[in-house]
């Protein structure tokens, strides 16, 4: 029988000093012996996805204490990728994932907490907390801040839906007037919450549902809606039950590694492919699997991508649907229900509520449930009122979207595409693979061949695109932007957005060892592995080389002979200390980022730290 970890600091005469300090935080004799549960919050005024979280930790804490636990809250950092985008700030985004994971480990282990409720939301915060949870392997429940409402504005006498990406594209489009650009900017992000499309934040919050670590509705129920409060109340109560099950009943099924099993990871990736999630999710699932000591690799993702269809299409792949529409159609559970009926899921998995997949679907799938309260929850909709307050409105759709032939979520028979929303490509400069969000690629360019235009920084590529140096038919190659080479593996949302602004969204391809925002669409291929800074063959591409992309056959090929590539590699190696570094790039890299780069692996490994360099 495991004993409470917290007993280390609360029991025994030799812990008098620790108890004295606990008393100074408000604990009493009656609390020593209760489970200490960390409320891992991520409130910050820098990020719209986290600006409303200040009081939500207290909400969870009250429920923990009412259920017989002791709640202790702390915050992690949170970087807003949209605000950090397009300048040196983006170098810090992916490395912040490791800092978040480490900081959670540090706080929880230093104070011997017994369990956690993780209040996350945006791009690197959910993955960082997920990595920490699987590393620590103590009871945990995730409850995120929820999605932002979609923006809406009237253009050309028509009401259209908007998001962050629209503001970026129109702001750079010389054909768009200043007044229209300003109108879109002011309308694109109307409320608190994670940006309203199927971008990285919302993708990851959906995947925590599929992994079983959060409650139904977590990924899609709007941040502003009053119904979302119940998820926080439930999390506080339920975590005490899970904690007591493990420590008092020796029930290891309450632990995250037993909930987020390999079968659950396969289900999460299947969901990701079916909903056309962000390519960043691949990076984060690979990293989380390593923390869980699960053998889940690019090969597994490749196999799944070849058999899973696309059943949901959401911004940025279409402007018709945003997360509020996914929720109306049944949310994550609605998509999982269609995947289950197609025989594409592992059914022998459980979630933090203790429900198996069939039980979860029976209770929460809008196509199956007889529970009017569940149906009412999925009718929770937007209010269209600018606010930074959680739970500030209670508007509802008149009806659910249960049209599986033409609605937001489709059945297998009416899939948007027989091929899923993500694909792994392999070739002679991506020997370990690269990722493309096929959900955002127009059918006309699924096969594409063109000459390379090579840039050794995102900044140079942006300057060339906006300066008219990139033309229709080109393949833009941005290298030395991987985890090690950047360092930090910057997102390339500005280059892809500016290609659209210049009318080249369906006329060019972009390939990088960096990564893309969840807001990216178009023929954008990232995570090329090995990266250039690690001796990857992407570092051998020269201007004018022909590159052939074949998404249907999962191929990507540099049309240069093996002999020529060998000669180029020899010349690169001969540069000595300058080998596999950019030739003409001035970039200030801090000590913190250099430390990150010294241990970073390529994207096919999840861009995690290379444990072999630490002797582990």
Curated annotation (Swiss-Prot):
Query: Does the UniProt entry include the keyword Iron?
Result: yes
Q: Where on the chain is N6-carboxylysine found, per UniProt?
A: 124
Task performed by this protein: Functions in the biosynthesis of branched-chain amino acids. Catalyzes the dehydration of (2R,3R)-2,3-dihydroxy-3-methylpentanoate (2,3-dihydroxy-3-methylvalerate) into 2-oxo-3-methylpentanoate (2-oxo-3-methylvalerate) and of (2R)-2,3-dihydroxy-3-methylbutanoate (2,3-dihydroxyisovalerate) into 2-oxo-3-methylbutanoate (2-oxoisovalerate), the penultimate precursor to L-isoleucine and L-valine, respectively.
Entry EC no(s) = 4.2.1.9
Q: What PROSITE patterns does the database record attribute to this sequence?
A: ILVD_EDD_1, ILVD_EDD_2
Output the InterPro entries linked to this UniProt entry.
Answer: Dihydro-acid_dehy_C (IPR042096), DihydroxyA_deHydtase (IPR004404), DiOHA_6PGluconate_deHydtase_CS (IPR020558), ILV_EDD_C (IPR056740), ILV_EDD_N (IPR000581), IlvD/EDD_N (IPR037237)
Record's cofactor remark: Binds 1 [2Fe-2S] cluster per subunit. This cluster acts as a Lewis acid cofactor.
Q: How does it assemble?
A: Homodimer.
Binding sites annotated in the UniProt record for Mg(2+): 81, 123-124, 491
Q: Which residues bind [2Fe-2S] cluster?
A: 122, 195
Q: What does it catalyze?
A: (2R)-2,3-dihydroxy-3-methylbutanoate = 3-methyl-2-oxobutanoate + H2O; (2R,3R)-2,3-dihydroxy-3-methylpentanoate = (S)-3-methyl-2-oxopentanoate + H2O
Q: Where is the signal peptide?
A: none
Record protein name field: Dihydroxy-acid dehydratase
Query: Which Gene3D superfamilies does the UniProt record give?
Result: IlvD/EDD C-terminal domain-like
Family statement:
Belongs to the IlvD/Edd family.
GO aspect biological process, one term: isoleucine biosynthetic process
Q: Which organism is it from?
A: Escherichia coli (strain K12)
Report the GO molecular function annotations. Answer: 2 iron, 2 sulfur cluster binding; 4 iron, 4 sulfur cluster binding; dihydroxy-acid dehydratase activity; hydro-lyase activity; iron-sulfur cluster binding; magnesium ion binding
Keyword annotations from UniProtKB, A to Z? 2Fe-2S, Amino-acid biosynthesis, Branched-chain amino acid biosynthesis, Iron, Iron-sulfur, Lyase, Magnesium, Metal-binding
A GO cellular component annotation here is: cytosol
Q: Which SUPFAM superfamilies match?
A: IlvD/EDD N-terminal domain-like (SSF143975), LeuD/IlvD-like (SSF52016)
pH effect summary: Optimum pH is 7.8-7.9.
Question: Which cofactor does the UniProt annotation name?
Answer: [2Fe-2S] cluster; Mg(2+)
Annotated pathway, please? Amino-acid biosynthesis; L-isoleucine biosynthesis; L-isoleucine from 2-oxobutanoate: step 3/4; Amino-acid biosynthesis; L-valine biosynthesis; L-valine from pyruvate: step 3/4
């Amino acid at each position: 029988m495991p004993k409470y970890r917290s007993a280390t600091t609360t029991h025994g005469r030799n812990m008098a000093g620790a108890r004295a300090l606990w008393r100074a935080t408000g604990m009493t004799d009656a609390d020593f012996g209760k489970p200490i549960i960390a409320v891992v919050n991520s409130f910050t005024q820098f990020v719209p996805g986290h600006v409303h979280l200040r009081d939500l930790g207290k909400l969870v804490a009250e429920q923990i204490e009412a259920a017989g636990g002791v709640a202790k809250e702390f915050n992690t950092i949170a970087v807003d990728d949209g605000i950090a985008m397009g300048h040196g700030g983006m170098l810090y985004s992916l490395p912040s994932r490791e800092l978040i994971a480490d900081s959670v480990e540090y706080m929880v282990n230093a104070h011997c907490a017994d369990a956690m409720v993780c209040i996350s939301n945006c791009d690197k915060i959910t993955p960082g907390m997920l990595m920490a949870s699987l590393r620590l392997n103590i009871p945990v429940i995730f409850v995120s801040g929820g999605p932002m409402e979609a923006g809406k504005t009237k253009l050309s006498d028509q009401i259209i839906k908007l998001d962050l990406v629209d503001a970026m594209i129109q702001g750079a489009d010389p054909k768009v007037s200043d007044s229209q650009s300003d109108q879109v900017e002011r309308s694109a992000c109307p409320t608190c919450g994670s940006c309203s499309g199927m971008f990285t934040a919302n993708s990851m919050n959906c995947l925590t549902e599929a992994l079983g670590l959060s409650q139904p509705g977590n990924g899609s129920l709007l941040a502003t809606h009053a119904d979302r409060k119940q998820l926080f109340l439930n999390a506080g109560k339920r975590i005490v039950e899970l904690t007591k099950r493990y420590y008092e009943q020796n029930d290891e099924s309450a632990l995250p590694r037993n909930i987020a099993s390999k079968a659950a990871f396969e289900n999460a990736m299947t969901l990701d492919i079916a909903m056309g999630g962000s390519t960043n999710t691949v990076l984060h699932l690979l990293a989380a699997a390593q923390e869980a000591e699960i053998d889940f690799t690019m090969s597994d993702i490749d196999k799944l991508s070849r058999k899973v269809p696309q059943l949901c299409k959401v911004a940025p792949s279409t402007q018709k649907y945003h997360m509020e529409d996914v929720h109306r159609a049944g949310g994550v559970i609605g998509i999982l229900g269609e995947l289950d009926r197609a025989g594409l899921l592992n059914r022998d998995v459980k979630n933090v509520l203790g429900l198996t997949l069939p039980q979860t679907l029976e209770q929460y799938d809008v196509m199956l449930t007889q529970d009017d309260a569940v149906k009412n929850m999925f009718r929770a909709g937007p209010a269209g009122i600018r606010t930074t307050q959680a739970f500030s409105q209670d508007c509802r759709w008149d009806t659910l979207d249960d049209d599986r032939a033409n609605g937001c979520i489709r059945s297998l028979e009416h899939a948007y595409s027989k091929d899923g929303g993500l694909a792994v490509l392999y070739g002679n400069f991506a020997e370990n693979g690269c990722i493309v969000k096929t959900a955002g690629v127009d059918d006309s360019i699924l096969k594409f061949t063109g000459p390379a235009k090579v840039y050794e920084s995102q900044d140079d590529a942006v300057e060339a695109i906006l300066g008219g140096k990139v033309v229709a038919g080109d393949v833009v190659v941005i290298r030395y932007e991987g985890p090690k080479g950047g360092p930090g593996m910057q997102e390339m949302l500005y280059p892809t957005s500016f290609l659209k602004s210049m009318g080249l969204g369906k006329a060019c391809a972009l390939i990088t060892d960096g990564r893309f925002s969840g807001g990216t669409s178009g023929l954008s291929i990232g995570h090329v592995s090995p990266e250039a800074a690690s001796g990857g063959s992407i570092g051998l591409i020269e201007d004018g080389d022909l590159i052939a992309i074949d998404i249907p056959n999962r191929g990507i090929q540099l049309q240069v002979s093996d002999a020529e590539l060998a000669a180029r590699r020899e010349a690169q190696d001969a540069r000595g200390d300058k080998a596999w570094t950019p030739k003409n790039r001035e970039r200030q890299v801090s000590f913190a980022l250099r430390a990150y780069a010294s241990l970073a692996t390529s994207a096919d490994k999840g861009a995690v730290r290379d444990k072999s360099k630490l002797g582990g």
